[in-house]
Amino acid sequence: MNIIIDPKVSGEELRRQLYAGNLIILTHLRALENFVDYTREQLIDLFRPYEPEHVHEHIDPAEMARILGGWKPRFIHSDTSKKLVREIIQEAGFPAEQTHYDLPKPRTSFPQGHLTTGVAFAFPWHRDTWYSAPAQQINWWLPIFPVREDNAMSFDPASFARAVPNSSGAFDYYRNNASRLTTAQQVTREQQARPAALSHQPEQQLVIIPAPGQILLFSGTQLHVSIPNTSGLARYSVDFRTVDVPDLLSGRAAPLVDVQCTGTAIRDFLNVADGSAFDEELVTKLYGAPPSDAMLVFEAPNA
């Protein structure tokens, strides 16, 4: 695994590097700075008069779940959020017509002892592909406030193309969509199926700490984990994902070595240029026909 900063290459070469297991950090995108400013202002307004990084000292977990459960869907489905994400993707060199993206997800990581379930779930060792992500998925992760090695996330470079025992066989994307309707109510106990590595103890871990205004790109095959937050500060980040259409059609992708889940998240991805979803006939050809009663795409109440 290599860590590549601001590579001067095409979007196609960026994807090739990511499919090979490398990590890429982009540091000079004006659209990214605009997105960070926009998100930070929302968090400051949401928690006023408290500082977002210290808000857990003043608000209990149940009230925090209520506040975030109301704000996160508004942020995710905001036209401004989507517009800013599209601008980031295009400024990074990914052609709009052949790139699909999913909606930006704000993540919150509170210090241990506070809210770590539901809307603030702390992810164990996992690959996004265990959550029915396509093999062509590229993750884009950016902090909103400064992060540290004791509240960020960690990678296991040695396991990128090596099978790891995991629980992804119990995960079905369509059933998970239905269970997400109660995510904001999960305050003390996690109720959703969350695929994870089983008793995973990597020999080495790699922690990447981009600054606000920088963004980390990595393949959905990368094995990574939310570091238990012992910093005393709340961590706020946003992530979204992209899929390249020619890569999807040709099968060019990162390796799938241990994926056992069912269903597919591909319908969540919208074209950067015109907002269209993948054609259902194509999805069925690539991934098979879904059950007749499946919730193919999650729809948040009042989104």
Segments predicted by a language model, with ranges:
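Non-heme Fe(II)/2-oxoglutarate
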Residues: 222-303
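Conserved double-stranded beta-helix
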Residues: 90-154
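Residue-level detector of short, conserved catalytic/binding motifs and their immediate flanks
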Residues: 138, 214, 236
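Short secondary-structure capping micro-motifs at structural edges
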Residues: 125-129, 202-206, 225
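Glycine-rich, often proline-containing surface loops adjacent to acidic residues and nearby aromatics
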Residues: 19-23, 59-72, 99-104, 136-138, ...
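N-terminal auxiliary "cap/dimerization" subdomain that precedes the catalytic jelly-roll/cupin core
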Residues: 1-92, 211, 283-303
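Short, solvent-exposed loop/turn segments at secondary-structure junctions
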Residues: 31-32, 113, 130, 146-148, ...
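Double-stranded beta-helix
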Residues: 150, 154-219
